[in-house]
């Protein structure tokens, strides 16, 4: 049985022909198809080819993912292992780009997973370390910072 193919074009002009089942992981494309707005090629102006190829790779692995009710624990474990390896090979900047693209594509599974990866990465980091990771300038004076620490002492594990 042959599957319908969908042609996606990235913002930098790369074309990707994927199965419709994979494309249906992206709700923006589902809505385009339902509204008959999906022409010969679907342009994705906010996603580069490099990022789109990674997202498609992830979507292909998840096209037949077991549901929450599914009893196949081995399949779930294998997919979780693949997911972990997928994220491990990416740097933080690429994960940020994937989050933005997954949000644009409305690909909830990847958006949640990539966001959780970033959350896990910054967990147990000091405010200074988080500022460095995200390139955030500290606009508090030392006095203001001390006052905030006193007001919220219960949140700090010091």
From Swiss-Prot:
Pathway terms, separated by semicolons: Protein modification; protein ubiquitination
Gene Ontology biological process: auxin-activated signaling pathway; jasmonic acid mediated signaling pathway; protein ubiquitination; response to auxin; response to jasmonic acid; ubiquitin-dependent protein catabolic process
Region named Interaction with the F-box domain of F-box proteins: 99-157
Keywords: Nucleus, Ubl conjugation pathway
Subcellular location: Nucleus
Principal subcellular localisation of the protein: nucleus
Gene3D superfamilies, per the entry: Potassium Channel Kv1.1, Chain A
Main function: Involved in ubiquitination and subsequent proteasomal degradation of target proteins. Together with CUL1, RBX1 and a F-box protein, it forms a SCF E3 ubiquitin ligase complex. The functional specificity of this complex depends on the type of F-box protein. In the SCF complex, it serves as an adapter that links the F-box protein to CUL1.
Protein's recorded name: SKP1-like protein 18
């Amino acid at each position: 049985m042959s599957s319908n193919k969908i042609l996606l074009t990235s913002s930098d002009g790369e074309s990707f022909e994927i199965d419709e089942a994979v494309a249906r992981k992206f709700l923006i494309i589902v809505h385009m198809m339902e509204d008959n707005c999906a022409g010969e090629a679907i342009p994705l102006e906010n996603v580069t080819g490099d990022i789109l190829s990674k997202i498609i790779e992830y979507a292909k692995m998840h096209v037949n993912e077991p549901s929450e009710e599914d009893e196949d624990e081995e399949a779930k474990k294998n997919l979780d292992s693949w997911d972990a390896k997928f994220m491990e090979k990416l740097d933080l900047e690429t994960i940020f780009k994937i989050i933005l693209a997954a949000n644009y594509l409305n690909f909830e599974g990847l958006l949640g997973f990539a966001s959780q990866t970033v959350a896990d990465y910054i967990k147990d980091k000091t405010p200074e370390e988080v500022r460095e990771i995200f390139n955030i300038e500290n606009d508090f004076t030392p006095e203001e910072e001390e006052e905030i620490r006193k007001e919220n002492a219960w949140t700090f594990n010091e």
